């Protein structure tokens, strides 16, 4: 799911917003 993927990236980068 794109939402889960974006959330994982956001957590990995430690940013408040997802990185696409």
UniProtKB/Swiss-Prot annotation:
<keyword id="KW-0106">Calcium</keyword>
<keyword id="KW-0528">Neurotoxin</keyword>
<keyword id="KW-0964">Secreted</keyword>
<keyword id="KW-0638">Presynaptic neurotoxin</keyword>
<keyword id="KW-0443">Lipid metabolism</keyword>
<comment type="function">
    <text>Monomer (alpha chain): Snake venom phospholipase A2 (PLA2) that possesses a low level of presynaptic activity and the same high enzymatic activity than the heterotrimer. PLA2 catalyzes the calcium-dependent hydrolysis of the 2-acyl groups in 3-sn-phosphoglycerides.</text>
</comment>
<protein>
    <recommendedName>
        <fullName>Basic phospholipase A2 cannitoxin alpha chain</fullName>
        <ecNumber>3.1.1.4</ecNumber>
    </recommendedName>
</protein>
<dbReference type="GO" id="GO:0005576">
    <property type="term" value="C:extracellular region"/>
</dbReference>
<dbReference type="GO" id="GO:0046872">
    <property type="term" value="F:metal ion binding"/>
</dbReference>
<keyword id="KW-0479">Metal-binding</keyword>
<dbReference type="GO" id="GO:0090729">
    <property type="term" value="F:toxin activity"/>
</dbReference>
<dbReference type="GO" id="GO:0004623">
    <property type="term" value="F:phospholipase A2 activity"/>
</dbReference>
<keyword id="KW-0800">Toxin</keyword>
<keyword id="KW-0378">Hydrolase</keyword>
<comment type="similarity">
    <text>Belongs to the phospholipase A2 family. Group I subfamily. D49 sub-subfamily.</text>
</comment>
<keyword id="KW-0442">Lipid degradation</keyword>
<comment type="subunit">
    <text>Heterotrimer of alpha, beta, and gamma chains; non-covalently linked.</text>
</comment>
<comment type="function">
    <text>Heterotrimer: Snake venom phospholipase A2 (PLA2) heterotrimer that acts as a potent presynaptic neurotoxin by blocking synaptic transmission and synaptic vesicle recycling. Enzymatic activity is essential for the neurotoxic effects. May act by binding in a calcium-dependent fashion to neurotonal pentraxin-1 (NPTX1) and neurotonal pentraxin-2 (NPTX2), but not to neuronal pentraxin receptor (NPTXR). Also binds to taipoxin-associated calcium binding protein 49 (RCN2), a protein localized in the lumen of endoplasmic reticulum.</text>
</comment>
<keyword id="KW-1015">Disulfide bond</keyword>
<dbReference type="GO" id="GO:0016042">
    <property type="term" value="P:lipid catabolic process"/>
</dbReference>
